[in-house]
Amino acid sequence: MLLRIRSPAGTARLTVQPETTGEDFAEAILNTIPAADPQPDPATLALSNQPGAAGESVPFHALSGRTVGDMGFSHGDLLFLSYKPRAADPDSHPAMQATAPHPQPAQPDPSHPKTHTDPPMPNTIPLRDLSSVQEPEIDQYWEKQTGKIERKRDPAFCRHGDKAMCDYCMPLEPYDPKFQSEHQIKHLSYHAYLRKLLSSRPPTASSATDLPPLSPTSLSVITPCPTGAHPSFPDGICSTCQPSAVTLQSQPFRMVDHIEFASPSIIEGLLSAWRRTGTQRIAFLIGREDKYEKVPMGIKVIVEAVWEPKQEGELDGLTVETPWSDESRVQEIAKWCDKGLSVVGMIYTDLTPSPDDITKTLYKRHAQSYTASSLEMLLSAAYQLSHPLSTRMSPTGHYSSRFVTCCLTGDKDGGVDILAWQASEHAEAMVKAGIVEASVDPAVVRVRKPGEGEYVPEVFYSYKNEYGLQVKMPAKPTFPVEYLYVNITHGFPLAPSPLFLSNAFPTENRPGLHDQSMQVVITQLAAILKTSDAEIGDAGTWPGRIKKDVEKWLSDWHLVTFLCMQGLFSLKEQQILCRAATAHAHPNDTHALEELFASGGWQTLLTIVDSEASANARSNPPPTSSFNNLGIDSPAFAGPSTESSAPPSGPDSVGAGAGAGAGGGRERVCPHCTFVNEHGGSDCEICGLPLDG
């Protein structure tokens, strides 16, 4: 016989036999109450067939001496358990009461094997110590600010002096709907949304700590069931452990409000790869977070560089390694370069030449087609799940993500535009639960059909119809992809001040296009050093101009990461290298370059450059002899013919120099176009100029 028991702790199912005694039946009912919940007072326990006072209530002690069979229950009956929580014993655990101002959750009772406390109720999250959560600096900054929107005195409505204030000029809250509408702000900033959630709470320090305002969405079945009244899913499921239905709406806030690219060369680097190969490219954005003043309590991401992972580009897509094997190393190097620098997002190309004019790009992402496809949205959500935001405003210690996605695609004028977005928090939950999948139509998302051992909750989406009424529609089998993301604005600074000044070094993981190697490092560094007569191996003799050129050459993200990953520098020297590469952005760090020049890794690099330059000098003839071998006067000795500039005489001579006699049938090299003339004339067969110069 199956009986359902509904209590303040939830609904549970019990399987009993007609011969089960009343004492065993009462104990089974008590076992459905999780130990983490307030325990009932035995004197107040009562069982009823109707909720509240509407039905007949039977106290628990009346069950003694009886069996379930003679209580009149039928299979599937719903019974209601009522009780009052047991009052805490003031004499018990005095030390706990003295140090803990708030009640602590009860610990699991080992005598009850069916008691589970993770979590105690459906859609709740276990409490954890949030004091150890390290929040980003930008979040710490906005938490200390009032966020009020200052307004000036309104000359039309204000009837007071300059030092007074009224309803027409008092500061507004950062979530003020009228201000949001007047300034066409579609999404609240993250911290403005938090202020809105906390506005109804008392302004105490403990209210935000004890009751975090954000609750991460969970669409997975809770296993094991908190009640412990049935086997774990898929063998059993109840209203306590199954996820609730979800209604999708446009997310009212966004975690990032703006993306700022520090330099146009960041975008140009990706475009140049596409122009040269015709295949798509993807890269991860390296940047930091900062305040954004154009929206109340706004946050922007400043992109300083990109890192291209191992990938195989195609004409209409690409294949990229997952997971990204070098991410932890890149994160470490970025942190050394600048405080707060990390992986903040990804960017990829979706460019197709126009069939009518190959100099223009095809405009395929617009209001009549789609902005982001369902496959792209699932990819964005997956990367956001792997880069959660640490915050004390969520009971789990993290909420959503600030990982952004950018796409380079064609615009209506045939140029290239940037589209930027983030997957919503609901999209992350749906991807994590595995209840959605991509569709052939890029503008819609499919809700998966549950397979064996799977559970997919009901999904709806809400919108306003043509009459302005809010309508709820089932999302199965498909729903628009717009419900799963929020748009983000982007731009470039008016006065660029990038962290990395150079981009001369080749980009990583571009086989066949250009490769990174130590030979490229040696060649580029030697080209800088050879412009001075100073000794290559002694950086102390370099003039200031050379040091400035080397410092600018080092300020290249791709060069820094390459040198750090080659093993030429020790761990400490790698940190010095990163400091030297960004020293121009930190005026107080004046000794980074000198420390690098004095390091062992740098001396080893200079030794290699010096030996390479010496080897090239021995293998290549001097410029003067090279010109003489061609029968041409060296530009360094231009002018009247002298003894030192005369061509070598003897049988090994190749030809006559400029100024030799015009007669004879020997080969003569034209001093203007270097063509070898075999006739005995005085003019060149190719350019027609005189062979005598």
Curated annotation (Swiss-Prot):
List, as start-end ranges, the regions of compositional bias called Low complexity.
644-655
Instruction: State where composition is biased (Polar residues).
Output: 613-631
Q: Where in the cell is it found?
A: Cytoplasm, Perinuclear region; Endoplasmic reticulum membrane; Nucleus membrane
**The MPN domain, residue ranges:** 259-399
Q: How does it sit in the membrane?
A: Peripheral membrane protein
Matches recorded under Pfam families: NPL4 (PF05021), zf-NPL4 (PF05020)
Gene Ontology annotations for the cellular component aspect, listed alphabetically: endoplasmic reticulum membrane; nuclear membrane; nucleus; perinuclear region of cytoplasm
Coiled-coil stretches = none
Principal place of residence: cytoplasm
From the UniProt record, give one GO term of the biological process aspect.
protein transport
Q: Does the keyword Nucleus apply?
A: yes
Name the Gene Ontology molecular function terms of this record.
Answer: ubiquitin binding; ubiquitin protein ligase binding
Q: What keywords are annotated for this sequence in UniProt?
A: Cytoplasm, Endoplasmic reticulum, Membrane, mRNA transport, Nucleus, Protein transport, Translocation, Transport
Segments of this protein annotated with the region Disordered: 85-132, 613-665
Job of this protein: Involved in the import of nuclear-targeted proteins into the nucleus and the export of poly(A) RNA out of the nucleus. Has a role in the endoplasmic reticulum-associated degradation (ERAD) pathway.
Instruction: Tell me which family the UniProt entry assigns to this protein.
Output: Belongs to the NPL4 family.
Q: Specify the protein name.
A: Nuclear protein localization protein 4
Gene source species: Cryptococcus neoformans var. neoformans serotype D (strain JEC21 / ATCC MYA-565)
